[in-house]
Regions:
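Predominantly the C-terminal beta-signal and adjacent terminal strand-loop region
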Residues: 42-44, 50, 54, 60, ...
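Gram-negative (and chloroplast) outer-membrane scaffold detector with strong preference
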Residues: 75-178, 241-251
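Strand-connecting loop/turn motifs
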Residues: 22-26, 83-85, 157-161, 204-208
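C-terminal segment of classical bacterial N-terminal signal peptides
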Residues: 14-22
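Extracellular loop and loop/strand-boundary signature of outer-membrane beta-barrel proteins
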Residues: 59-62, 124-131, 180-188, 225-233
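Short glycine/proline- and aromatic-enriched beta-strand/turn motifs that initiate or cap beta-hairpins
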Residues: 23-80, 171-175, 239-251
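Outer-membrane beta-barrel translocator domains and adjoining extracellular loop/strand segments
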Residues: 42-47, 100-106, 155, 174-183, ...
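Residues that define the transmembrane beta-barrel architecture of outer-membrane proteins
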Residues: 68-72, 134-138, 160, 189-195, ...
Length: 251
């Protein structure tokens, strides 16, 4: 799946970039909101001092995209003067993962040093496993675009622009969890390295202002703090994103 996603982004970059029309350099800023869909995943809890090392299989996650603070993000980038179809950008996005602990799940491993292999309501042991103050991606990205309906005066970069890109960077999390009635110490931490790929369309309403919509894919192996130990989960998410885009004069 990962190879297919990367291949799709690379092919998209080649196709979009290869047919782009000349234009001037362009700094830009995007602000956006959206909704994420995180795939079910196993959660592993390791609390060495307590004799706990167990896995909860196929945990479902709610996105809580519209709960305060909602899904939000911003991107600052630059398309090059010599290669106006090619750009770079720094992207920040905040979304959430909240485990549905009411469901019955398969537990395997050890609990209190004793073997554990049973189907139990997740909240029998893990009362809460949330990352609600953020799965926060900070990525450096390469991107390409293909300009349509260009006008030298009003829309020099194209009134409609197809774009695609990919990047990677640290994932900063703020986990909130409770295991066997003990809550974790809550704080921000770098929980892993994340990768993303995206593709979308940008429509300019004015020479310097427009709107855009895009699909985003993210993946990371998160390692977060739990009481007296660590919790691990593979985050694979699909996102639908929309917002405002601002094309800035190239000073």
């Amino acid at each position: 799946m990962r190879r297919a996603a990367v291949s799709a982004v690379v092919i998209g970059m080649v196709l979009l970039g290869g047919n782009a029309a000349p234009a001037h350099a362009e700094p830009f800023v995007d602000i956006y909101t959206g909704k994420s869909y995180t795939r079910d995943a196993d959660v592993r809890i390791r609390q060495k001092g307590l004799g706990n090392d167990f896995r909860v299989e196929d945990v479902a996650f709610d996105d809580d995209s519209f709960r305060d603070p909602p899904y939000y993000g911003g991107r600052v980038g630059y398309f090059f003067e010599r290669y106006p179809w090619l750009g770079v950008a720094i992207d920040f996005v905040h979304f959430k993962m909240s485990a549905d602990t009411s469901e019955t799940k398969h537990f395997t491993g050890t609990l209190g040093g004793a073997p554990l292999d049973a189907r139990l309501p997740m909240n029998t042991i893990v009362h809460r496993f949330d990352i609600t103050h953020g799965v926060n991606y900070v990525t450096v990205n390469g991107l390409v675009r293909h300009s349509l309906l260009t006008d030298a005066e009003r829309f020099p970069h194209g009134r409609i622009q197809l774009f695609a890109g990919a990047g990677l960077g640290p994932v900063v999390t703020h986990a909130e969890n409770s295991i066997q009635n003990v809550q974790n110490h809550r704080s921000y931490e770098v929980a892993g390295l994340g990768v993303q790929g995206f593709a979308g369309v940008r429509t300019m309403l004015h020479k310097y202002v427009g709107v855009f919509a895009q699909y985003r894919f993210t993946r990371s192996d998160l390692d977060v703090r739990v009481p007296s130990g660590r919790g691990k989960v593979e985050e694979i998410s699909h996102h639908v994103v929309g917002g405002l885009t601002f094309s800035l004069p190239d000073f």
